[in-house]
């Protein structure tokens, strides 16, 4: 019984990593660079949100992007900004005719990069 409890704790700790390793950080930075080339601001926002989802997945969180953000919110000092960016993505994904300015897309990128910096290994 004790062994099962210890194993469960180890699995939970491994699933919700504290920091991303260098390889994971590099993959996510590469995804951000690809998202930069998506062109129109609305497309960049959609791509940046996919990167956010992948970042949360790499940290060990599961579910929809929103569920992952709820589980991982405490990990980020800019959690409110991350939520605002995800809500912008939801707006453009679900509202016909929704538009995004270049500055809004650029803001999403900056928020995402700050979040990545906070959870990346310091090496």
Predicted feature locations:
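Broad hydrophobic/π-residue packing in well-ordered secondary structure
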Residues: 32, 94-98, 112
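Histidine-centered, metal-coordinating catalytic motifs and their short helical/loop contexts
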Residues: 75-102
């Amino acid at each position: 019984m004790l062994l099962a409890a210890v194993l469960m704790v180890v699995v939970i700790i491994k699933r919700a990593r504290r920091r991303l390793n260098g390889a994971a950080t590099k993959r996510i930075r590469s995804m951000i660079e690809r998202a930069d080339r998506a062109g129109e601001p609305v497309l960049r926002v959609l791509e940046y949100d996919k990167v956010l989802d992948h970042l949360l997945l790499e940290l060990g969180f599961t579910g929809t992007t929103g569920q992952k953000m709820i589980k991982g919110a405490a990990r980020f000092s800019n959690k409110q900004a991350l939520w605002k960016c995800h809500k912008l993505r939801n707006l453009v994904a679900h509202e016909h005719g929704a538009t995004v300015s270049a500055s809004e897309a650029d803001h999403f990128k900056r928020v995402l990069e700050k979040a990545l910096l906070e959870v990346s290994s310091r090496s």
